[in-house]
Every structure is written in structure tokens, then in C-alpha cells.
Amino acid sequence: MRKATIFLLLSLLTFAGCSINPVTGQREFVIMSTAQEIEMGKQNYAPMQQSQGGVYDVDPALTIYVQGVGQRVASQSGVSLPYEFVVLNNSVPNAWALPGGKIAINRGLLTEIESEAELAAVLGHEAVHAAARHSAKQQSRAMLMQVGVMGTAIAARDSDYGGLIVGGANVLAQAGLARYGRGAELESDYYGMQYMSKAGYDPQGAVALQETFVRLSEGRRTDWLSGLFASHPPSRERVNANVATASALPAGGLRGEREFQAAMRKTIEIKPAYEAYDEGRKALAEKNIEKALAQANQALTLFPDEAHFHALRGDIRLVEDKFDWAVTNYSRAIDRRDNFFYYHLQRGLAKKELGQADAAVVDLERSNELLPTAPAHYALGDIAKARGNLPDAIQHYKVVAKAGGEYGQAATTELVRLELPSNPGAYVNRACSADGNGNLVVSVRNESTVQVTGIQVAIQYNDASGRQQQKRFSVRGQLPPGQVASVNTGIGPYTAGSSCPAHVIAAQIAE
């Protein structure tokens, strides 16, 4: 019966989710509709750009050029999507596509390719990911796995492992869907070459591009390993497949070396400034402040109009606890580019350290408007707590707590600190059982992430004459996270499994 239930759930989803791949014409399992994909891409395009360095706006003509090449190639897909193309201010060589045709290419990848045909190959490849609904298929696979997990959890809920299966399967699902699979990459290569050929480009550009990627992957450059190769792993198989595809397509077509180099002229000229900036970021991460500042100053000397460079110097001053200098540098960054979350976030944090709470809130809220982050919400929680606005503080800390990581742990601790005195039962669970004599035993479990002390439980019960009584019992010592302590109340008789008359009425953090 349990297996039948799971099979029915999976069968219903599979039947409902079958659709025709608009690129290959094959029937595939996709639950998400095209309209949902478009909306997902629309909602996430701007936040993704923010999280990847923001728009590369120092050379608007380059963006216009890239958009033109992208639209020229995507128009050959035969799939009606609201395609958009953007260049991101990020030195990591990478490109990506969101559902619904929202595509981005990093400055760092543009500086590595050599022709318009190679650019067309990159953008055509990403256009296929969108047109062939590869992200939607991944989402559908995840949903199908979740149904299988749900069915297994239903089937195993009476076992000792019921609570473990869901979490473990979720981890496996996330790990399995971390990047496009081999089939999706080969499919995007093949149809991307069809698109670029129809658009008038030489398909040999795609062959040259993959040859370059394989060579760079063999050199194991860390920026490539963390960028394009993490999500689009190159291989000799892909090179050979591209050679075979190119041989079946019309020979010739536009290579566009001259056009590409003309469009890239300014970006190539200022590339040394970004290289100095990247070295400065690396030095700062390694806590080499002197080198970081020297590299930031070199970058600013070469190209003083880039806001990222001013923000780097602000970060250095922030690490040095020179908060007023940091504010000055972040303000210079904002003067040059006021629509990037990071500058507002960092200036808000610096102003908070200077005790300028009102000004800090303005910056932090502006940062969250552009891209909600854990540091911004955590700082806003701190400010609200200092002002005695506990509801707002709790709201911000709860947002951060869900994010996990270092900030999430700190926010969870703050939540316990704020809520434990007034709502101890939210963090300390109680359970009732009977000892061998039928007397009530109350067990308490610390569900928080911090050590707790001063736990008190109240027992409401009727005595032999039927009068309602209340007694309080204290749990001795400190209770670490996840640990259980028990108190034998001596009150009885208590029937195991009946309503638990105990309530946790007090607890505090063990400082």
C-alpha cells in the first residue's frame, strides 16, 4: 500500500509534467510552465546581477554590442522568450542563463575570448540553456525527488529513521543539481552552433572556444575553476562534438575579430587596473593590508572612475577601524555608482561603528532594497535592539537565522537572548513520562544553539480532594544544546501517554 501511494504520487506528477522540449522536439518531464519560468527569471535577474558584481557600466557601448550579438543569435532559436543580455563587472570568467532568457556574461570572460564568433558561441550556448528549459528541468527533477522523499517519509514516519530520510535526501538532491549535466552541456553546444551558423557566424568559433577552455582547464587557473568551469565543465569530448557539428554546418561565416577587438578596446585598456584591484582583493582576504592598499591605489591611479576600486580602499580602512575614512571612500564609490548594494552596505556598517545609527539605517535599508543580505539585516537588528525596538530586532534576526553560516549562528543566539526570558517554551521542550511507581517525570530538552540555565517547570494537577494545585521544579545546572535533563516530581499517579501537565516557565542563557 505504501509503495502504491508513492508510485501514484510520482505517476501523477510525471503525467502532469510531460511537455515538448521547444528546442529538441522531445517529450520531457517539466512541471514548471513557460510563464512561470519567465517570471522566475524576471524576479531573479536583478538580484543575481547584484550578487555577481553589478552591471559593467563603465563602457555602455560594449554592453550594446554584446546585446546585439546575443539578440542576433537568440533570434534563431525559434523560441519566443524575452531575451536579455548584460555584461557584469566581475573578473571571474563566467556566463550564465536564468529561466526565461535572462543571460549574463562577465567582463572576465570577455577579456579571454578573441572574436565575435566566439562571443556568439558563448551567448548561443546560454540561449539554448534558456530555450531548452534546462533550469526548469532541474527544478522539476528536484520536485520529483521531493515527492519521492515525501512518500518515503510518509512510509517511514513510524520508523526510527523517518526524521533522517527527508534531510538526507534533500542534501543529495541539492548536490545532484548543482550544475548542468553532461547531456545539457552537449545539447547547448550543438544547438548553440546551429543558432550561430544561422545567424551568419563561423561555427569554427565554437570549436576554437572549447579548445581554449580545455587548454585553460588543464592549466587549472583558479579563477576559471571557480567560474565557468564549475558550472560548464570543458572536455575533449565537447571539443570533438563541436568539430563534428561544425563539419556538418555551412563553412565560412563571420569571424569578427576586428569588430570584437574594436568593441573591447576600452575594456582591454583598463584591464591592468582590474588586475591590480583583483590582487588587492586577494591581499585583503589574506590580511596583507599594506599590499592591499598599494594595489587599490594602483588601480585608482590607472582608472579613478571605477567605484569598485574606491570600495576596496573603504574595505581596507574598515578593517583598520578607520571608520570615518571608510565612509569617505564608500561615499566616493556611491557617487560613481549609486545602484550597487555593496557600497551602501559597507558604508552603513561603518556609520554604525561611528554611532551614526540614523544614517546607518538609511544605508542598510537601501542596501537591502538592492539585495537583501545577512550582514545588513543583522546590523539593522543590532540597531533596533539598542533602541529598545525588540519586535523589529527579532524580525531582522529571524531573517538572518534562516540563512545559516556565521551570521545565522550569531542571529540565532541573539534571538534566544531576546525571546528566551519571555517565551522559554519556544526553546526548551518538555515531555512527560511515569517512573516505576507511576509518579510524573518531566524531561526538558534544550532546542536552542546555546547553553541554557535556570530552567523551571510548573506542574498543574488535581490533588486527592480534586483541588487544582501548582508546583514548580527547577532543573539543576546548565543544559547544553540538544541535551535532555529530567526531574522526578513525585506527583502521582500519572498515566504514561496522557496529557502532559508540565510547562516551561523560565530559562536563561548561561553566560
Q: Each predicted region: which residue ranges?
A:
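Canonical tetratricopeptide repeat
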Residues: 312, 346, 379, 413-414
